[in-house]
Amino acid sequence: MKKVLFFLAVCLMGVRLAAQDLDTVPYYDDNQMPDAGIYLPAPPDTSSMLFIDDFQQWLWGKSMRSTPRGQQASWESEYSVERMCQIYSDAMGFVISKDATPAIYRLVSRGQKTAAQAVDRAKARYMRIRPFARMNEHVAGAFDDEEHLRGNGSYPSGHTSLGWTTALILAQMAPEQQDTILRRGWEYGESRVIVGAHWQSDVDAARLAASTCVARLQASPEFRSDMAAARTEYLLWHGAAPANVGFPNTRHILPAPIDTASYRYYGDVAAHWLAKSLRNTPRGIQAVTDHSKYVEDFLSQFSDCLDMTLDSTVAPNITAYLTYVHAKLRAESRRLKNSRFRRRPYVQLGDGSLIPEEEEEESTDSSYPSTHSTLGWGLALAMVELTPDSMNAILQRGFEYGYSRVIAGYHWASDVQAARLLASYTLFRLQREPEFQTLVAAARNEYAALRGYAGIPVADAASGAAFARAGDNIVLTFTDGQQTGVLNVYSIDGRVIRNVNVSGNTSVSLAGLPHGTYIATFNGRIIFVSFKTTF
């Protein structure tokens, strides 16, 4: 019963129709979002080998402050929806504002409000000291409130969470300009290192938190409705969409892989040696198990997270959905591998791996990016859209899957991070594909049915009224006299299925509707959730 109530609270509270300015309302509350303090590891301590990359990047950022790039970073420190809109207006070539493009502005504004909650709990948990405070200097962002920052945790970066969330959302809305948008979003996070407000690992963590935020948003009927409206508004400016828009090109978005001449190579080497120390532990055994990357392997891993069985017999729709996503992620990872060759750690350092039988075959394949990590993180994000009751466990497993490749000696840490970013924007590009939408809808409904979430009244019902399900009918009964109002029934994608003016006891039929999730509201409040399991 606890999982049922949590599922309802987390998955379906997105239908909020209260009379207020929706531009300022997040799509989900913080307790309905993944918690980065659970699925991500703690930030590196200053005594950790992993701090080497943070320190090197701090030095690099400091060297950039007196350059035009440093001026850009300082200007970007303003923390507002208007500044974010201005940044992406410049990138996309038209004005995004509340007056000029109200639908796109709403999407950005509400996305930002939600993204802020993606990192808040982790910030409070770790309260990491920021670079400028640790190094006894002043922050270089013109709009940064230094005193506020001193009392606000550095890990993960809030600015980066907002910037990368916005980039992912706008790239989904406008795939015609996805490379430019995503590159701009990547630079926005880099700016926080330059001004000394964040360590590199804060920024890396925030990009992952942002990707979980956008994955979570896909389950919100309000988000999908706002996305559709923003897309329509965008096409009025852009014109007819091209027939075929491919996937984002990572070569245009992320920097080239780190080579041995780069100062950042020392961070990769440090991470390699630290991970290598885990090989003779249970974590090393897990890394060997994680070498397998078939769909069936991921279904088994996610089954453990969910405490239920997922396979092609029990969950054919979920299997079909993950199989489709798996193929797309793998193809995009291969496309990047074929264009960027990097030697694997065990080849570069000559120190062997955890899986020696694969070394000869894999030695001529690029280390960058990690396909295993692309699949592990991408499929975990894909599952978030289905399983709001188990988000953190699935995301933690997806993250660990990538780290297993560092432990095994098959990938550098930076290969894994690049793979996770590739996975996120590839997955959200798929949201525009009709086949993907068909598969994810079927998978979402199948998961709800497997969990047994069927016809659950919501506790926050209007006073003096009782709600129940009788067969294919939603029945509203007033217990303290007649009430009037509007009873709406929505599909999970936000479409109004039934609209009834209520005066007294009412019964609304769901007969004839396909298998799916339906949400009833009375005068704007969610009153009933029905997972229809019969036709």
Show where each model-derived region lies:
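Sec-dependent N-terminal signal peptides
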Residues: 4-13
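Sec/Tat signal peptide C-region and signal peptidase I cleavage site
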Residues: 15-19
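Hydrophobic alpha-helical bundle signature of multipass membrane enzymes
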Residues: 20-194, 216-222, 226, 232-408, ...
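Short, glycine-anchored, charge-dense loop/turn motifs used at functional sites
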Residues: 336, 490-497, 518
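Short beta-strand/loop motifs in extracellular/secreted proteins, especially
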Residues: 483-488, 516
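Short, surface-exposed loop/turn motifs with a glycine/proline- and acidic-biased composition
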Residues: 498-528, 533-535
